Amino acid sequence: MSAYAELHCLSNFSFQRGASSAAELFQRAKALGYQALAITDECTLAGIVRAWQASRDTGLKLIVGSEMQVEDGPRLVLLVEDLAGYQGLCRLITRARRRAEKGSYRLLREDFAEPLPGLLALWLTGAGEPLAQGRWLQQVFPQRLWLALELHCGQDDARHLQQQLALARQLGLPAVACGDVHMHVRGRRALQDTMTAIRHHLPVAEAGQRLFANGERHLRPVEVLQGLYPQALLDESLAIAGRCAFDLGQLRYQYPRELVPEGHDAGSWLRVLTQRGIVRRWPTGARAEVLKQIDKELTLICDLGYESYFLTVHDIVDFARRQHILCQGRGSAANSVVCFALGITEIDPDRSTLLFERFLSRERNEPPDIDVDFEHERREEVLQYLFQRYGRHRAALTAVVSTYHGAGAVRDVAKALGLPPDQVNALADCCGHWSDTPPSVERLQEAGFDPQSPVLRRVLSLTGQLIGFPRHLSQHPGGFVISEQPLDHLVPVENATMAERTVIQWDKDDLDMVGLLKVDILALGMLSAIRRCFDLIHGYRGQRYSLASIPPEDPATYEMIGRADTIGVFQIESRAQMSMLPRLKPQNFYDLVIEVAIVRPGPIQGGMVHPYLRRRNRQEPETYPSPELEGVLKRTLGVPLFQEQVMQIAIVAADYTPGEADQLRRSMAAWKRHGGLEPHRERLRRGMNRNGYSDEFATQIFEQIKGFGSYGFPESHAASFALLTYASCWLKCHEPAAFACALINSWPMGFYSPDQILQDARRHGLQVLAVDVGASDWDCSLEPIPVQPARAGNGPPGQPALRLGLRMIKGFREDDARRIERARRQRAFVDIADLGERARLDVRAQELLADAGALQALAGDRYRARWEVAGVERQLGLFAGLPSQEEAPVALPRPSVGEDLQADYHSLGTTLGPHPLALLRPQLAARRCRSSRDLLAVEHGRSVSVAGLVTGRQRPGTASGVTFVTLEDEFGNVNVVVWRDLAERQRRVLVGAQLLKVDGTLETEGEVRHLIAGRLSDLSPLLDGIHVRSRDFR
């Protein structure tokens, strides 16, 4: 039987061209008996690591390559022969991508001026003068050029074959058979046509000759190819494949070495810095156990060759601290005492149980992964520092493969099949944005579609095939790769969408597979808010706080947390967390670690939450299968809540080594996507049986492990987050004005809008002052309270007032605000004309200020301010020389309370006047709607109706289709539970209403109250144009 190697094949990483994944292509090629498969995506190696994995999974040889079009020149397929050829291909792709806009490339003849050893070229003849092109290519690729013949059962195949063979003879070139493969099986042709139409922004019906004439560009049986090509051309494919010996496993990555001073190597310098950190962290001396652990970690770090990596992360964190940028390491790195000593993380080993193997293990072939959060508004300074320190040729961001999800896939397919725009939008609305399935029949019927329509069935079929396909490369939120050698010796580099940034073509999973190290430079809004809060406190009181100096274990802070009074704080501000807080009632830092971790899909789906709560509330006894496991589970009352505990159970009860336990952890994280967990079921059972544990216990542990596959927190990660949770709660409890001010100045971030933060602050008795050009800066600020306002409840003692900043005004520019600040420092504004002249404000800026009520001190009210800005009274003065009686000032009506309210929301997104529902309360009462305050007196199980502004909609993946809605009225919030069937029946009201009435049943459990919805009504017309921001399904 004749053999064959396919040398020209595109995967779906030739975006919107290739219609099959590498895994599908390799499985099919293996089944057809191919000897090798080249993945040659167009000017990219973005999918080559996945192809390498597919090659290893199937045992079929991978040839690395790329298809390229030379500008004003030939089209080529370049195949990698050896390491030098791979590096040359990476450099070519990098040059072509860097000189073009993101998503395109420009490959020039001059790029081939330097020798390209180790690259074999297949010439795909087409436009242009063939003899001239061929002779140029022979000079570029001497003895390494073939003429590629690609036949697809066209009417002209025989003539084309003879012409091409004649050209090859004329130039003295060998010829080879290729397939120009775009899909693994013929059945993907419809998808390939659809993707072509999507790429060209045309309906399929108008794509014409842009579509292939038939479905022959798939992996074909060798017997079929023998009927098309002379045998010599098939044999030549094997000869070329035999020359291509490169394997991605040959790549050798080196970390930068320039951080080591003279007289040291990386290991000795890391020990010096760690020793300095020990003195700083433990001024009175560290415990012997801590020193022993540090020595163990340093030995392993040096043995595995990761010293330079730790030095680099330390350098990044040190830079941030020198620039007063708040930062903190998190994730598995918080298991490392060395990271704590170096200042990378903040988890004191005396406050938590650490498992270093979760971070770094001799037995696993995986580099460490250190995540560091920085203030979200200053992270760019850190990124640019890295570019400047290492150079753009050695530093770049990691890519993220953006894939098709339900809404995007159905939208693109429906457009390509020619559906009108209104139907395209309606179909997309039937999908959840991140859904990985086409819309359900029920959702389609609700939207007025006929699920049996042939066109719709075709749309849904193609959508199902497209979901999960790569759509484009985007930028990782912060993954940064730094190398000793130029990065384009390892992987191609291209431009990011954002200027001054470059991105490698591989994502995080690719880096792990080939052993490249990255550090995550992440942005965290809460760090910005905390640093701003520290600055505000220092400016107002003269007291300087840091994360380390916040008083620990403060009873008042935990009492506030137990009441679920946590709007605006970190991690425990969602409705799910706020429902859990009164049940768990954290009393100390470790309780807070548990709180952060327990409201996650892993513990929920693993059935761990309710047993833990019952044991915590002494409704069920603590039980342990053995004294050894009691040591593992005691701190969580016998219920495994953290990944580290699962690993320790495997070690203690089933005889796993630490490295094997980490492999179990990796399998937990990936089993839903890739499987691989089942082999551990039997391994755990046998190991536990051997140590005296029952099959029932082994099954229970395995099911809990599967739950962790749905996003369970490592304890180290939860502890890192809990530090920020506690800090934000302490600030909210003891410095509420500064905290609210800092949150708004750091927005957009977090869970709540500025309006919700301000409403919460006012409910706590804080005085909020209106935006005013005579007092407001760009940012919100703190002011002394000149006169204690009369109010029903007194605010926290000693708290300043919060003055709204000009940043609150929609559309107002910061430059205008800064000029107002500078002019005001010289002297106060006399009138609007004086403001406009000295702050150099155009009419648009003055109108925005007038509409926001920021000119009331100069004009009296919004209407008068707008009148003066328009210059109406100045224009009346033009007629002053005419004989007439003296004109009295124009009498303008003052805006009503409702008009001011509407203007506030339109301009500021919030109001300091009465809450909208306070004005609507009589109308709501006529509809028998109770307030959130009234619900406090309603008994469990009673039917009740409420109405409120929708401020949040959530549908967690663990909630079996349940939607949680948060309603706000003038007194507080109401948590509403909408079961799946009601949500589907009344989806339009649920998703679209701004003012929602809910008829339902009140359920109470201790201090937790929920309204179980029975009917939903949209009362939004009562708002009369007021728009309220809602956080939906995030």
UniProtKB/Swiss-Prot annotation:
Please name the InterPro entries in this protein's record: DNA_pol3_alpha_NTPase_dom, DNA_pol3_finger, DnaE2, DnaE2/DnaE/PolC, DNAPol_HHH, NA-bd_OB_tRNA, PHP_dom, Pol/His_phosphatase_N
Task: Keywords in alphabetical order, please.
Answer: Cytoplasm, DNA damage, DNA repair, DNA replication, DNA-directed DNA polymerase, Nucleotidyltransferase, Transferase
GO CC terms of this entry: cytoplasm
User: Which superkingdom?
Assistant: Bacteria
User: Where mainly located?
Assistant: cytoplasm
State the top-level EC class. transferase
A Gene Ontology biological process noted in the UniProt record is: DNA replication
Q: Which GO molecular function entries does the Swiss-Prot or TrEMBL record give? A: 3'-5' exonuclease activity; DNA-directed DNA polymerase activity; nucleic acid binding
What family, per the record?
Belongs to the DNA polymerase type-C family. DnaE2 subfamily.
List the PANTHER family.
DNA POLYMERASE III SUBUNIT ALPHA, ERROR-PRONE DNA POLYMERASE
The name of this protein is Error-prone DNA polymerase
Taxonomic placement = Bacteria, Pseudomonadati, Pseudomonadota, Gammaproteobacteria, Pseudomonadales
